Amino acid sequence: MAELVPFAVPIESDKTLLVWELSSGPTAEALHHSLFTAFSQFGLLYSVRVFPNAAVAHPGFYAVIKFYSARAAHRAQKACDRKQLFQKSPVKVRLGTRHKAVQHQALALNSSKCQELANYYFGFNGCSKRIIKLQELSDLEERENEDSMVPLPKQSLKFFCALEVVLPSCDCRSPGIGLVEEPMDKVEEGPLSFLMKRKTAQKLAIQKALSDAFQKLLIVVLESGKIAVEYRPSEDIVGVRCEEELHGLIQVPCSPWKQYGQEEEGYLSDFSLEEEEFRLPELD
């Protein structure tokens, strides 16, 4: 079986590990570092979150660890369950289970997380971005308002960015667009604040376009260990397929730039699920 790894926040239970019986001696920050070091050897981690035990339980901590890959989470669970790892007493590790059937819309990773995931699978020089267009739309709207003689007490900075992510090893290019609008008042905030907000809005537009481009890609991890990429501009695909169905993906180039002017939905930020959605398994 081949595993598909999307550029999305991992919310599946089989990508989430619950770790408990953590000692009360170290601080939460120290435990976070130790857990990250111990579990990152099995695969790239999306997040490590450490929480104190409930007041009715004995002193100590538990943790919620999210992997991008379900295979990596399974390997980590088998290797670390009932092992001492970094403390004198063994910890218990289980795959996550939910209180109830909760369905979440897949959330897009932010641009930095997308680049981190791409670097992990394709190498630090395995992908790059090419900005096709970066345009400020604020002046256009301002001229339209001047022509109509409609006074505006406040203005907004608006930037549009179109770019493409390039994966040379897979002969793949994926387009993305981003639009950012930042309300402001040039008179109240002053010229320095205006310049800073303008620079920030420009940067956010690039980041949103970069994230949008990555959302159209799926990382394909074959059983042989080879890595491929699949380009799907308008479909949400999460799961595992048989390797025969994915045969040839490594040599199949992605589609060129399409639908450049198509309006995209708003950018989804990088969120984490609340820990209350999971429960600790029954102790053996």
UniProtKB/Swiss-Prot annotation:
Stretches the record annotates as Necessary for nuclear localization and for nucleolar accumulation in response to heat shock: 1-92
Gene3D superfamilies linked: 3.30.70.330
Compartments it resides in: Nucleus; Cytoplasm; Nucleus, Nucleolus
GO cellular component terms given for this protein: Cajal body; cytosol; nucleolus; PML body
Function: May confer resistance to the antitumor agent cisplatin. Binds to DNA and RNA.
Note on domains (UniProt): C-terminal half (amino acids 134-284) contains cytoplasmic retention domains as well as determinants involved in its stress-induced nucleolar accumulation.
Species name: Homo sapiens (Human)
Designated name of the protein: RAD52 motif-containing protein 1
Expressing tissues: Expressed in testis.
